[in-house]
């Protein structure tokens, strides 16, 4: 069932959206739209479990990530928009750096009752690898028509500072931090 939900979510991004405000606005400027006009949503969900936030309540605790191919198709479509100048305002999601992160053992995740996978400490079952996200960033930045992409979504620094038992994951977190700066 979860695989079907993930598939439906991924497919929903490939529908023929216009990327324009509702016609009822008839050419009026919408400041909030200006901010997201050239942004790309990479995933849904958040495992932060913050008491003040409702993201996990309406998007879920488990991250559902889009495929690299789907993301690149959307970015290519943006580059063909008449007023696109080469700058993506956001490659992100509810928390930008949770893309493709999940528990190593899904059975443990399904049984878990913790509201947060990262507080008060990062769950040892959580794979905090930033390499899939770095791969997306590099692929997007290499596309013709892209001058620069930004991360406008919130970043969980606790994930960047977390020391994994895997040195490659720690290197990827440092590389991601350099990418942000």
Regions found by a protein language model. Give the residues of each.
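Flexible loop/turn segments at secondary-structure boundaries
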Residues: 5, 19, 47-49, 59-62, ...
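Conserved SAM/AdoMet-binding glycine-rich loop
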Residues: 77-181
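Short, well-ordered alpha-helical packing segments
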Residues: 13, 47, 54, 72-79, ...
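Amphipathic alpha-helical segments in well-structured domains
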Residues: 68-72, 130-133
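N-terminal pre-triad scaffold of radical SAM enzymes
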Residues: 27-54, 72, 84-87, 181
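Iron-sulfur (Fe-S) cluster-binding segments and ferredoxin-like electron-carrier domains
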Residues: 53-70
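Short, flexible loop/turn elements at secondary-structure junctions
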Residues: 16, 42-46, 54, 92-95, ...
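Flexible, acidic/Gly-rich N-terminal and inter-domain linker regions that tether
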Residues: 1-36
